[in-house]
């Protein structure tokens, strides 16, 4: 039976009544957004954020935050929270994972998307965090004529497909050493990473949207002045972190 949303909803043969209906799909359900748009449900484009995952050796973050060579057996894996304004655009860390892993998070084989997680013991030798910058409505205005209120979704998808293009099959992700990313040079090799599918060297600073690359490079330089050692070629940026929030509401 076709579902009708007014003050009641049919789901199969069951009738649910109420003053409102919450459709809790999760922010990566692009097919649901497109279905609602086709059915005439009002959607509205909104600002969101995109960037990369940045990964350091956990021992390096420990030494920066605890100001000692080793945290010992009693202190937990150190974390951080960073934010700056670069050219009027916000840059910030997101979902920092001490003692954690970078994990694949794509919902389509044609995309490359990464996220992070920490096991309960926070006992990985790596620390990672999302590092993102704000994406404004004006940044995807050029897609509005064709996609309307779904333009942000399409901009997000284009970013993720570029990452897949410069990464590889089987969820291999594009990556670049952090100091190389900031300096605008290629990485001839990559350090070890927690990302199990693997990474390949790539000039993220060249193929990602220019405003994202420039904002992240400036932000990392700022964070390197606040946390001595943060800006280092021992660290990696891995592409891409693009699902911090939904581009529509």
Q: Where do the language-model regions lie?
A:
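Residues forming the flavin
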Residues: 2, 6-249
């Amino acid at each position: 039976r076709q579902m009708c949303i007014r003050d009641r909803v049919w789901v199969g043969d069951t009738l649910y009544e109420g003053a409102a209906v919450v459709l809790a799909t999760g922010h990566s359900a692009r097919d649901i957004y497109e279905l609602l748009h086709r059915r005439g449900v009002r959607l509205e484009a909104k600002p969101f954020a995109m960037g990369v995952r940045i990964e350091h050796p956990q021992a390096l973050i420990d030494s920066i935050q605890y100001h000692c060579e080793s945290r010992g057996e009693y202190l937990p894996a150190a974390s951080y929270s960073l934010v700056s304004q670069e050219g009027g655009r916000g840059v910030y860390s997101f979902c920092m994972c001490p003692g954690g892993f970078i994990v694949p998070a794509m919902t389509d084989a044609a995309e490359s998307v990464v996220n992070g997680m920490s096991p309960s013991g926070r006992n990985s030798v790596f620390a990672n965090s999302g590092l993102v910058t704000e994406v404004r409505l004006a940044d995807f205005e050029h897609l509005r004529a064709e996609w309307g209120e779904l333009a942000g979704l399409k901009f997000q998808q284009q970013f993720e497909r570029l990452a897949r293009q410069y990464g590889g099959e089987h969820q291999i992700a594009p990556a670049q050493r952090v100091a190389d990313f900031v300096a605008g040079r290629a990485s001839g090799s990559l350090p070890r990473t927690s990302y199990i599918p693997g990474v390949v060297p790539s000039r993220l600073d060249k193929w990602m949207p220019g405003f994202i690359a420039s904002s992240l490079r400036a932000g990392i330089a700022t964070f390197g002045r606040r946390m001595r050692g943060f800006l280092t070629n021992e660290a990696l940026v891995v592409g891409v972190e693009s699902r911090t929030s939904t581009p529509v509401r």
